[in-house]
């Protein structure tokens, strides 16, 4: 049994669990802070589906940066009339991806579906109503039911353009560090699903004890709750 939580001052390693290209950007930021990085993704992103007709859409909704990348992959070039549509991004990283893709009218929420829905409701109240449906570019997995939050406020058409497939195993370098010095490892976590998938990897690798030693740094309360439920003892919101 762990007597107390590991101290942040003991952290040497940061395990980056995001898929590329997010992993590379995060790793660079972590190294700039003086920590060592070990890569071990929990998911890989696969493109799928087709983009529906965009004419008549009143706006676009992205609940991850991967949604932005998926749309760009399918369209190759974002048409000018699409680039100027209102874009609702779940958080800053997704908003930055939309900006980099060429979208010019971006509203960012605070990292969860609830605040995203609140931003859309506020615009609906200002406008009176939207001129057409909102296209939600999404993956096969949903963190929340956006359409239910916006019932009677806006029509949301969900378009699945990517799938975040689980990676079954920890990378060998990550496993070695977890087995030798897990209390010196911090792990940024960005979604409830990522927390669950990472815990599954720990179990499959036979390093269950590390669940009580590593420090998960969670994007939100929802992520922290999922991490705690999955067995991580020292999850913190960062």
Predicted regions and their residues:
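Signature of uroporphyrinogen-III synthase
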Residues: 1-238
């Amino acid at each position: 049994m762990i007597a107390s939580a590991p101290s942040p001052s003991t952290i040497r390693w940061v395990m980056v669990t995001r898929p590329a290209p997010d992993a590379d950007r995060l790793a660079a930021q972590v190294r700039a802070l003086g920590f060592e990085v070990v890569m071990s993704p929990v998911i890989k992103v696969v493109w799928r589906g087709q983009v529906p007709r965009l004419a008549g859409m009143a706006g676009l909704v992205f609940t991850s940066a991967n949604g932005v990348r998926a749309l760009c992959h399918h369209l190759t070039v974002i048409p000018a009339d699409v680039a100027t549509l209102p874009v609702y991004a779940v958080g800053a990283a997704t908003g930055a991806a939309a900006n980099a893709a060429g979208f010019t009218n971006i509203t960012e929420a605070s990292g969860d579906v609830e605040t995203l829905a609140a931003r859309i409701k506020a615009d609906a109240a200002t406008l009176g109503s939207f001129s057409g449906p909102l296209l939600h570019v999404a993956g096969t997995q949903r963190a929340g039911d956006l359409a239910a939050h916006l019932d009677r406020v806006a029509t949301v058409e969900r378009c699945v353009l990517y799938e975040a497939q689980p990676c079954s195993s920890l990378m060998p370098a990550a496993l070695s560090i977890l087995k030798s010095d897990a209390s010196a490892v911090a792990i940024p976590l960005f979604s409830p699903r990522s927390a669950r998938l990472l815990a599954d990897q720990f179990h499959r690798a036979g390093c269950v004890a590390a669940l009580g030693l590593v420090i998960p740094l969670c994007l939100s309360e929802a992520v922290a709750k999922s991490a705690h439920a999955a067995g991580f003892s020292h999850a913190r919101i960062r």
